[in-house]
Amino acid sequence: MTLDNNQELTYRNSQSLGQPGFSLAVNSSNPFNHSGLNFGQNNDSKKISVENNRIGEIVPGRVANIKVIGVGGGGGNAVNRMIESDVSGVEFWSINTDAQALTLAGAPSRLQIGQKLTRGLGAGGNPAIGQKAAEESRDEIATALEGADLVFITAGMGGGTGTGAAPIVAEVAKEMGALTVGVVTRPFVFEGRRRTSQAEQGIEGLKSRVDTLIIIPNNKLLEVIPEQTPVQEAFRYADDVLRQGVQGISDIITIPGLVNVDFADVRAVMADAGSALMGIGVSSGKSRAREAAIAAISSPLLECSIEGARGVVFNITGGSDLTLHEVNAAAETIYEVVDPNANIIFGAVIDDRLQGEVRITVIATGFTGEIQAAPQQNAANARVVSAPPKRTPTQTPLTNSPAPTPEPKEKSGLDIPDFLQRRRPPKN
């Protein structure tokens, strides 16, 4: 059963393959009739027909069709958060086995899966039920994904529907030719060992069915949220990080900015890329762009360092005061860390709500071999965008030196992580 408040919008792209208003009639007897030149029978005048001359006319191209699919309770919550945050240029879907949860979903398009199996009562925390429900509704899922160029699948791993159904949704999306990106969370430790074990199984199943998989470790959020944060608020933080992962990629495709990126650029980096890491940083002040970049690549959300990444998509967003020099400073900071031959795609977007601040989202792919543990964030004015400002004790791996204390505020310059300092030899 498909609950779609905008049914006609769902199939619009699949039914409009041509460009309306730009018809082209071809006369088989004269192959030059549609070339823009008039080779008529008038021997007195060999003029170019102005009426038929289409040189210089721009034919509008088709905008990339982006769909965000929230699977299960966690995925649905993330979609709700995206809608509340006015994420634009994408089509939202909520997919669930729980009919009651779907009625409360904010997505305009909703799909209940596994009606015969679950009778709308959910998967009971059992991923096997979630998988069977998705298999039962495979055709309906394909209809929902029809016409998509880029599909984001967001879910909270560890439960029943999200863990079991998300890999099937991804499989269908890939079969239909869409660039498929999974953005999922790994559960908090306090959610229990069973849920953690189920999450790992779901992640493995999803990893082989998507082009790129971004995993957000919820437990890492404990390093950046206050100790007094209620449980419900902690889960809202996790939902918002999922939102930022999707928006960081979709914005650079859908929103015209200082530096425009098209869908083909993003596909070049993310197609068949495997596991990916995501970092987010925000900063203000004189060196805000560089500090935000360092915060992003040193983010507590990173389970390991992005050093050596061979594919990077990053988005720098700022107010109307964002300068090209700041964009360059952020880009150079990231260039210093990744593989010298990395394929790097970045966009710069203006958001007037960020006056005085710069926000950077980094998605890194293409890792080989062992990846070292990520260093902690140390930029003095930088922070993770999803959390209020809070400094936590810095843990420096592979060293016996005592934990560093915060630098005095008067000190000039930037406290740069060790791995960045090692990667900054004199330029040739």
UniProtKB/Swiss-Prot annotation:
SMART domains: Tubulin (SM00864), Tubulin_C (SM00865). Residues 392-402 have a biased composition (Polar residues). InterPro entries: Cell_div_FtsZ (IPR000158), Cell_div_FtsZ_CS (IPR020805), FtsZ/CetZ (IPR045061), FtsZ_C (IPR024757), Tub_FtsZ_C (IPR008280), Tubulin/FtsZ-like_C (IPR037103), Tubulin/FtsZ_2-layer-sand-dom (IPR018316), Tubulin/FtsZ_GTPase_sf (IPR036525). GTP binds at residues 73-77, 160-162, 191, 195, 239. Keywords: Cell cycle, Cell division, Cytoplasm, GTP-binding, Nucleotide-binding, Septation. One of its GO terms (biological process) is FtsZ-dependent cytokinesis. GO terms for cellular component: cell division site; cytoplasm. This is Cell division protein FtsZ. It comes from Nostoc sp. (strain PCC 7120 / SAG 25.82 / UTEX 2576).
